[in-house]
Amino acid sequence: MATSSAWKLDDHPKLPKGKTIAVIVLDGWGESAPDQYNCIHNAPTPAMDSLKHGAPDTWTLIKAHGTAVGLPSEDDMGNSEVGHNALGAGRIFAQGAKLCDQALASGKIFEGEGFKYVSESFETNTLHLVGLLSDGGVHSRLDQLQLLIKGSAERGAKRIRVHILTDGRDVLDGSSVGFVETLEADLVALRENGVDAQIASGGGRMYVTLDRYENDWEVVKRGWDAQVLGEAPHKFKNAVEAVKTLRKEPGANDQYLPPFVIVDESGKAVGPIVDGDAVVTFNFRADRMVMHAKALEYEDFDKFDRVRYPKIRYAGMLQYDGELKLPSRYLVSPPEIDRTSGEYLTHNGVSTFACSETVKFGHVTFFWNGNRSGYFNEKLEEYVEIPSDSGISFNVQPKMKALEIGEKARDAILSGKFDQVRVNIPNGDMVGHTGDIEATVVACEAADLAVKMIFDAIEQVKGIYVVTADHGNAEDMVKRDKSGKPALDKEGKLQILTSHTLKPVPIAIGGPGLAQGVRFRKDLETPGLANVAATVMNLHGFVAPSDYEPTLIEVVE
């Protein structure tokens, strides 16, 4: 394949070309203290254990959350999409809030397919904006909402309703009044310019709408009743009065404000969501939007009685769940990622085999390749998707397709056709999400068996392996209090954790083809997933592009 000078990689001064390299991503496999809720620790995982305990210079931990994967803060859990973006791209691209800021500042948000879709309701129907009213910057930001309202009004929105959720968690309790007053002033200005703009409903973030991890669907239902049905136990003529009054209720604060609706002079709710309306959820952080998005988007829904399910045009600020593709429409697209490691390696003649089962196949191909479909060079690449089990929860068959993935990888390695064999083994994440601890232990054991199968093949061809993960999950299956102890609910029951975690993930290198003297560097302050691409390029015998995050390895004579 002809290589233009722009794509040509320099030869590594110390590491040879020509070694078969297996790149293994264990999905949802973080590192945490060993206890009964650490399914990785409790599973028989001899292959992974041998890496951790066998060679301290070739096993280490890297970050897979927060700023290391382009998310705004260290409170942001990683996920499979941003994780594979970072693994494949070798650089950190803005995700989440940063991406929204850029799209709003440039105006690109108003040119995208998502905004065009919701704007089709502007002429005859209402635009509803739902989210956390705060400048905390963790889930949402007031200035982004203000720009969204302004831009929508300038582009034809004639009737706007805002459904606010007060914060008091990421900002000071009591600050809600000021945020409501600021928003109300903006809406007054719009009304003076002929746009019918009002706050329509509200409530506290921990009590209305913003539940997460399917902890309490009643929270979502309270929001649904206020926003869609126009029903709530408290009715007010304006939102400032509502927040000030409800804060005086016993036990109430910004986080736990009871739901309210704004009504007109006749006592009728001013802004229930009805057929033909457009709805935008303006939080950029995903975790507290997914449940509400399901209620808005899924026709087949059984978590609570919605009473009615309006036919709306719904878009999220972002897509909140890449695996569920939820919501299916969104205002801000994923980052534009160029010059990925996969594209560089193909331009330099490296042949690649990539494989996973359906639930993570897109991650080891599309997301790895910078949100790009298809092959860079079909003569040098082969992607294989193994169909995932369907119609059952993953804890029913926790082994999933791990062994089939291992077999495909083994066969690809032994075929001698590929320089790189890349897989994602989904078990730890997909079974971890079910909250079934026993099944997740089985899942981790199956993943380790697949790893062993790949290691054995690498041994036969005298190749190299790189094993890492995209984020944590299976290593901690219980919610914890501030002291780190398992948290209990009001009835004294253990609170199971079904989400990703903030834990670091392991990375290990090895195999008979690994040159003598290769070890992980100790001088990198906070290495993360984005450092993996340069590392893999080095092991293929190349120096990574100068703007890539630095390699994790060094060669000691």
UniProtKB/Swiss-Prot annotation:
GO BP of this protein: glucose catabolic process; glycolytic process; pollen development; response to abscisic acid; response to blue light; response to carbon dioxide; response to cold; stomatal movement
Protein's name in the database: 2,3-bisphosphoglycerate-independent phosphoglycerate mutase 1
Entry's EC annotation: 5.4.2.12
CC cofactor: Mn(2+)
Subunit structure: Monomer.
Annotated family: Belongs to the BPG-independent phosphoglycerate mutase family.
Lineage top rank: taxon: Eukaryota
Organism: Arabidopsis thaliana (Mouse-ear cress)
Pfam families attached to this UniProt entry: iPGM_N, Metalloenzyme
Pathway field: Carbohydrate degradation; glycolysis; pyruvate from D-glyceraldehyde 3-phosphate: step 3/5
Bound cofactor: record note: Binds 2 manganese ions per subunit.
Catalysed reactions, as listed in the record: (2R)-2-phosphoglycerate = (2R)-3-phosphoglycerate
Isomerase found in the keyword field: yes
Residues annotated for Mn(2+) 1 binding in this entry: D429, H433, H500
Residues binding Mn(2+) 2: D27, S80, D470, H471
Disruption phenotype: No visible phenotype. Plants missing both PGM1 and PGM2 have no detectable phosphoglycerate mutase activity and show defects in blue light-, abscisic acid- (ABA), and low CO(2)-regulated stomatal movements. The double mutant ipgam1 ipgam2 exhibits a severely impaired vegetative growth with pale reticulate leaves and don't produce pollen.
InterPro entries hit by this protein: Alkaline_phosphatase_core_sf (IPR017850), BPG-indep_PGM_N (IPR011258), Metalloenzyme (IPR006124), PGAM_B_sf (IPR036646), Pgm_bpd_ind (IPR005995)
Entry keywords, A to Z: Cytoplasm, Glycolysis, Isomerase, Manganese, Metal-binding
UniProt-recorded Gene Ontology molecular function terms: manganese ion binding; phosphoglycerate mutase activity
UniProt-annotated binding residues for substrate: H139, R169, D170, R205, R212, R285, A286, D287, R288, K360
Protein's UniProt keywords contain Manganese: yes
